[in-house]
């Protein structure tokens, strides 16, 4: 964050700064730290020693460009070279070489990595910080039991608890408990040292009986007792060196390593002065923790809040990459040690070059980026999605929580989240509260804590100083929240201001304030900060809006929002989709795919993105915004990207909306739209789909790409070139051949022609035939071929498959079934497209574009859409754009309503349109029915809100099937569009059919159309040749499955025919 000339003004930090800082910290410090841990490796005879020289490592510039790595499915990485030495102790000679130890994936300008052609991003993880935490729980008798939990750097736990008799026990990983004296003795302390280093020696002596004295009589006895309890072994184990090593490895090294963060936290909590480089648990730590636990028992000290952010740490991209690099070096160490032993055994002369291989490092990073839960494919639906994805925080992942076991208390909002984690932006569903988003100004500190900035208020100095505070520090300050000074420092300070102190919200005098906020919505994430009038919305609807903005599809003709918040420009710039001038100069040439400009004494060519596919099949494209001969300055926008206009984020369109019912077509949030949105391409978007095919070498020979495909119609092959690949610019429909391919296979003996049999009998020649395995365009894939990539793997091996990728562009207008949404959680499905002349129209004759259901506003409590709607109408008439800061009620009561009404009044005056602002019902207007011309009975709210078209489109979801695959067990249709699934009539579907009075079709629904194998085959044949469909005689497969399952429970199910006569006789006898 940079300060300007005015010391109270500052810029918002770059939104992708979290990723860049983390990766730079890994390159600058993480690599050196892990390389310095690499040990010296000796052979068994200690004649040869191998070591790495950390000071001289280097990363080489990548050999390929980012764009080529994406198209050719390669990894954009850098080669790591380190100096290594091989020392011959007997000869006192050293051989030093610079060796290549592997590739490290690099981070590009978007803050992402390209691995195997995919943009991947590593999100940060929230973990419980290592240290000690005290809490109180009630036992089954309702008595408080105090416990202290020591959490290691790897997540292992050691619990200390004090019972009703003030006896202290240690419990390792919830196993059997042992006395604190036994644990301390096993760690090397005798009874005298224990009593000298505790504050309450009399309590320790109180539960020291003869049995306990025997256990701690010597270190060996204590270790045996501890090993017996820790490993849960029976009998009487015998003390030995191997037992000590096992205990040292399993417990003291794995479960007692605190790390630097844990050592720092433990020193602060227990008032210790142990050096921070001593990262293992010591006897002093155990005894100090026990002292504090005794103090809690007698009412001294405070308990810890486990959900406070001061007790959490952020595992950033730097930490995750450093852990993987350390794991790779451990594997490399084992490999080098085995290679040295093998070379000595076979009497070979090793060199540093042939001792080291790049496989451990390269495979470790590829496995991490491909399989780790925190490494995700970058969501590139729109620019906002890209930038928000890298700012996510997750409680999930290795060492963290799971969605099914996390409690409500962990998911809830905590006061320490203020300015650090957004209280609104989280995922919906099972992971709610477990995946959050960083606030705008939050940053990750050196110790893994989340920091947020404040302005310090000092009476002695008039200068304003900015401080970044961790969650443990801002508890001791009175922090003024939401004061008007955050935007306008000229306003006189109020006498009474709201403030936050020690996790409580108070109202105090201004003289008592220590710190104040620097931004009106610094506690929100990017997604929530883009919602205008967010203070008038329910938090649940704001959450939905934050998520739905990330699902907006870039439109072919984007438009800036009339009502915004002011962050749209920075989001667009930091997302990297726009081309920005790095220095000043003059434009020499510009066209659709490049910009050439000169400056600083040289000429530079900037390629523009043209029809690039995102992983959500949206179209990424850049459009030049400068002209030839124009002079530009540093930081100026050269080309707009997808969903940006003039360097600002533009996700949707400002359309004319009326809130009114219309013939039931907006029932349950459905949306009625005008055909103008189709004919004028208002909500038209381009989508690019990728289809690929591989050629392999089979046992009968290699597969061939060719345009000579036998037994196929000529119309299906008309778009192929001489190589058998579809031509650029071709228009293709469903079923067309994109790539012609023949797979060789051996023909059956009966299918040989007589001459083939003669050749085979005389010369032994095997006659092969080919099977057509072409790449065909699937259902719903019509469009224009915009790109074809034929990727041939380097090396010339015939076993490396060739990959052919065909990219097809689709133009999609808005249609019935598409999902649209506003920025206030108001979402709906398009239910009907009306002609323009039938839509309701205003008093100036203009028909509205959309009709929303007014019942969706009061119950959802998202009134912000009404403010935006009316202010947007005023802005469109006055040709103005508004940037509204949230929580403007702090300046004046009813500030939002006064602003909207004043703008509407001014618009009605300037345009001489009194219907824009009518004092009887301000914000509403009388509109007319397009079908009859009669006015509606009630005035209607009309306006111009910003409406988005979401990626949930009917073209991707609609699905039909006549026959297809069936489940093997139940013989019922599979589920899902991807599997060509069908409908499964279950219990509730049967109830629905019965309830609607169509029970007579249940038999065919449950037999022919479901799981009666023979009946559905007969139906298919009868339908083709004509005739009467036979009735099924036996039971369907699901009933057979029920019978088998009952038999597995030793229950036999039989059926008998009972006549009515016998039934009556049996009743009389009874």
UniProtKB/Swiss-Prot annotation:
Primary site of residence: plastid
Q: Name one GO biological process term.
A: DNA-templated transcription
Where in or outside the cell it occurs: the entry states: Plastid, Chloroplast
Q: Please name the GO terms that the record assigns under molecular function.
A: DNA binding; DNA-directed RNA polymerase activity; ribonucleoside binding
The reactions it catalyses are: RNA(n) + a ribonucleoside 5'-triphosphate = RNA(n+1) + diphosphate
The cross-references to InterPro entries, in alphabetical order and at most eight, read: DNA-dir_RNA_pol_bsu_ext_1_sf (IPR042107), DNA-dir_RNA_pol_su2 (IPR015712), DNA-dir_RNAP_su2_dom (IPR007120), DNA-dir_RNAP_su2_hyb_sf (IPR037033), RNA_pol_bsu_bac (IPR010243), RNA_pol_bsu_CS (IPR007121), RNA_pol_Rpb2_2 (IPR007642), RNA_pol_Rpb2_2_sf (IPR037034)
Q: Which UniProt keywords apply?
A: Chloroplast, DNA-directed RNA polymerase, Nucleotidyltransferase, Plastid, Transcription, Transferase
Q: Name one GO cellular component term.
A: chloroplast
Gene3D superfamilies from the UniProt entry = 2.40.50.100, 2.40.50.150, 3.90.1100.10, DNA-directed RNA polymerase, beta subunit, external 1 domain, DNA-directed RNA polymerase, subunit 2, domain 6, RNA polymerase alpha subunit dimerisation domain, RNA polymerase Rpb2, domain 2
The catalytic activity of this protein is classed by the Enzyme Commission as 2.7.7.6
Q: What class of enzyme is it?
A: transferase
Q: What PANTHER family does the record tag this protein with?
A: DNA-DIRECTED RNA POLYMERASE I SUBUNIT 2
**Quaternary structure (record):** In plastids the minimal PEP RNA polymerase catalytic core is composed of four subunits: alpha, beta, beta', and beta''. When a (nuclear-encoded) sigma factor is associated with the core the holoenzyme is formed, which can initiate transcription.
Matches recorded under HAMAP family = RNApol_bact_RpoB
Function statement: DNA-dependent RNA polymerase catalyzes the transcription of DNA into RNA using the four ribonucleoside triphosphates as substrates.
Q: Which family does it belong to?
A: Belongs to the RNA polymerase beta chain family.
What's the protein called, per UniProt?
Answer: DNA-directed RNA polymerase subunit beta
Q: What is the lineage of its organism?
A: Eukaryota, Viridiplantae, Streptophyta, Embryophyta, Tracheophyta
């Amino acid at each position: 964050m940079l300060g300007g000339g005015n010391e109270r003004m500052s810029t918002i930090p770059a939104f992708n700064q979290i990723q860049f800082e983390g990766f730079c910290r890994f390159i600058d410090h993480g690599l050196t730290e892990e390389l310095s841990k690499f040990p010296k490796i000796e052979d068994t005879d200690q004649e040869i020693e191998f070591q790495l020289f950390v000071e001289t490592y280097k990363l080489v510039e990548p050999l390929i460009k980012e764009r080529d790595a994406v198209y050719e499915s390669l990894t954009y990485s850098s080669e790591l070279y380190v100096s290594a030495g091989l020392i011959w102790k007997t000869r006192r000679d050293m051989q030093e070489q610079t060796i290549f130890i592997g590739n490290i994936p690099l981070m590009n300008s978007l803050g992402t990595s390209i691995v195997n052609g995919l943009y991947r991003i590593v999100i940060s993880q929230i973990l419980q910080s290592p240290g000690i935490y005290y809490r109180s729980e009630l036992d089954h008798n309702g008595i408080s039991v105090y416990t202290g939990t020591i959490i290691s750097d790897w997540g292992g736990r050691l619990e200390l608890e004090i019972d009703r008799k003030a006896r202290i026990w240690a419990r390792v990983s919830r196993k059997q408990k042992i006395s604190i004296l036994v644990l301390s003795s096993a760690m090397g302390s005798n009874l005298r040292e224990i009593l000298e280093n505790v504050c309450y020696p009399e309590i320790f002596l109180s539960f020291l009986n003869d049995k306990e004295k025997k256990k701690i009589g010597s270190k060996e006895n204590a270790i045996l007792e501890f090993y017996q309890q820790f490993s849960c072994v029976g009998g009487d184990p015998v003390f030995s060196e191997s037992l000590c090593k096992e205990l040292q490895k399993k417990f003291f090294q794995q479960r007692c390593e605190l790390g630097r963060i844990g050592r720092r936290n433990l020193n602060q909590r227990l008032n210790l002065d142990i050096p921070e480089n001593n990262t293992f648990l010591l006897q002093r730590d155990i005894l100090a923790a026990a002292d504090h636990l005794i103090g809690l028992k007698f009412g001294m000290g405070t308990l810890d809040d486990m959900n406070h952010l001061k007790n959490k740490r952020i595992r950033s991209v730097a930490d995750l990459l450093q852990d993987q690099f350390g794991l790779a070096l451990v594997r490399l160490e084992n490999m080098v040690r085995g290679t040295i032993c093998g070379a000595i055994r076979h009497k070979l002369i090793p060199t540093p070059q042939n001792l080291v291989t790049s496989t451990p490092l390269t495979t470790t990073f590829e496995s991490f980026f491909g399989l780790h839960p925190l490494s995700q494919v970058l969501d590139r639906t729109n620019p906002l999605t890209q930038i928000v994805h890298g700012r996510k925080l997750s409680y999930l992942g290795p060492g963290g929580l799971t969605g099914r076991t996390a409690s409500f208390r962990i998911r809830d909002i905590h006061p320490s989240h203020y300015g650090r984690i957004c209280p609104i932006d989280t995922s919906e569903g099972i992971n709610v509260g477990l995946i959050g988003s960083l606030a705008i100004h939050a940053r990750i500190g050196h110790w893994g804590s989340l920091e947020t900035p404040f302005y310090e208020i000092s009476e002695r100095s008039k200068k304003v100083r900015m401080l970044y505070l961790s969650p443990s520090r801002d508890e001791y300050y009175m922090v003024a929240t939401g004061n008007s000074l955050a935007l306008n420092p000229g306003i006189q300070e109020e006498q009474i201001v709201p403030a936050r102190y020690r996790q409580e919200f108070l109202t105090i005098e201004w003289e008592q304030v220590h710190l104040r906020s620097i931004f009106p919505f610094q506690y929100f994430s990017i997604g929530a900060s883009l919602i205008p009038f967010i203070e008038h919305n329910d938090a649940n609807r704001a959450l939905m809006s934050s998520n739905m903005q990330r699902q907006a599809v870039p439109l072919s003709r984007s438009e800036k929002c009339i009502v915004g918040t002011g962050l749209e420009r920075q989001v667009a710039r930091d997302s990297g989709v726009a081309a920005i001038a790095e220095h000043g100069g003059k434009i020499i040439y510009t066209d659709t795919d490049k910009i050439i400009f000169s400056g600083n004494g040289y000429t530079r060519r900037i390629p523009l993105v043209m029809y690039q596919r995102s992983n959500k099949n949206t179209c990424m494209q850049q459009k030049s915004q400068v002209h030839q001969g124009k002079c530009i300055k540093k930081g100026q926008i050269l080309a707009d990207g997808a969903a940006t206009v003039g360097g600002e984020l533009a996700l949707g369109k400002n359309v004319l909306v009326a809130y009114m019912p219309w013939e039931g077509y907006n029932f349950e949030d459905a949306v009625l739209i005008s055909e103008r949105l189709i004919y004028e391409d208002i909500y038209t978007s381009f989508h690019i789909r990728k289809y690929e095919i591989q050629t392999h070498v089979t046992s009968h020979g290699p597969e061939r790409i060719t345009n000579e495909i036998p037994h196929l119609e000529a119309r299906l092959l008309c778009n192929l070139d001489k190589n058998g690949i579809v031509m650029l610019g071709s228009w293709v429909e469903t079923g067309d051949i994109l790539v012609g391919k023949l797979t060789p296979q051996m023909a059956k003996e009966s299918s040989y022609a007589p001459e083939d049999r003669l050749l085979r009998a005389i010369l032994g020649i095997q006659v092969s035939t080919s099977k057509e395995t072409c790449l065909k365009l699937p259902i719903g894939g019509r469009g224009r071929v915009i790109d074809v990539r034929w990727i041939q793997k380097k090396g010339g091996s015939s076993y490396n498959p060739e990959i052919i990728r065909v990219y097809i562009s689709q133009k999609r207008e808005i249609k019935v079934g598409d999902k649209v949404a506003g920025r206030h959680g108001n979402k709906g499905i398009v239910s009907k497209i009306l002609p323009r002349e039938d839509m309701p129209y205003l008093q100036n004759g203009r028909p509205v574009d959309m009709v929303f259901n007014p019942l969706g506003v009061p119950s959802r409590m998202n009134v912000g859409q009404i403010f935006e709607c009316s202010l947007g109408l005023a802005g469109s008439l006055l040709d103005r754009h508004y940037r509204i800061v949230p929580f403007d009620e702090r300046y004046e009561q009813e500030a939002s309503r006064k602003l909207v009404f004043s703008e509407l009044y001014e618009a009605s005056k300037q345009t001489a349109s009194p219907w824009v602002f009518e004092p009887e019902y301000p914000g509403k207007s009388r509109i007319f029915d397009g079908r009859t011309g009669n006015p509606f009975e009630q005035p209607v709210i009309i306006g111009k809100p910003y409406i988005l078209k979401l990626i949930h489109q009917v073209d991707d979801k609609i699905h039909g099937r006549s026959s297809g695959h069936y489940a093997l067990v139940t013989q019922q249709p599979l589920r899902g569009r991807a599997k060509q699934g069908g409908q499964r009539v279950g219990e509730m579907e049967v109830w629905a059919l019965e309830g609607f009075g169509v029970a007579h079709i249940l038999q065919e629904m449950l037999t022919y159309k479901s799981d009666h194998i023979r009946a559905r085959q007969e139906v298919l044949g009868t339908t083709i040749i004509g005739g009467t469909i036979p009735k099924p005689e036996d039971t369907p497969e699901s009933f057979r499955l029920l019978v088998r399952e009952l038999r597995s429970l030793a229950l036999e199910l039989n059926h008998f025919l009972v006549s009515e006569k016998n039934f009556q006789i049996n009743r009389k006898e009874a």
